[in-house]
């Protein structure tokens, strides 16, 4: 699994946990709909740290909380080049 796929999966899990819509996350985070679609559909080759910070703020959690998930601890996690 790539880092980008892991971020998309983490977003999906948090949306479900918080009973939150993707639209609301876009509004709260300031991420454009098209950009969010690219992240969620795997068309985005690189998710920047700035984007992850915006996502965390959209969920009203810290960056540490966003990244504190076993999905990011996998030794099989790959980076895109």
Where are these regions (language model features)?
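Short, charged recognition helix plus adjacent turn
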Residues: 38, 67-81
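DNA major-groove recognition helix of helix-turn-helix
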Residues: 15, 40, 51, 67
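Short, basic-rich loop-to-helix N-cap that marks the start of a DNA-contacting helix
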Residues: 43-57
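A short, Lys/Arg-rich alpha-helix, primarily the initiator
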Residues: 1-21
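The alpha-helix within a helix-turn-helix
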Residues: 15, 26, 56
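Short alpha-helical DNA-recognition segment
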Residues: 20-38
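Residue-level detection of the helix-turn-helix DNA-binding "recognition helix"
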Residues: 16, 30, 41, 71
């Amino acid at each position: 699994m790539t880092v980008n796929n892991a971020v998309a999966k983490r977003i999906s899990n948090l949306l479900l946990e918080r009973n939150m819509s993707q639209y609301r996350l876009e509004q709260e985070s300031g991420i454009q709909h098209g950009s969010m679609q690219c992240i969620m559909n795997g068309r985005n080759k690189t998710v920047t740290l700035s984007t992850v910070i915006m996502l965390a703020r959209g969920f009203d959690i810290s960056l540490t909380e966003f990244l504190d998930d076993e999905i990011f601890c996998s030794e099989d996690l790959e980076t895109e080049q």
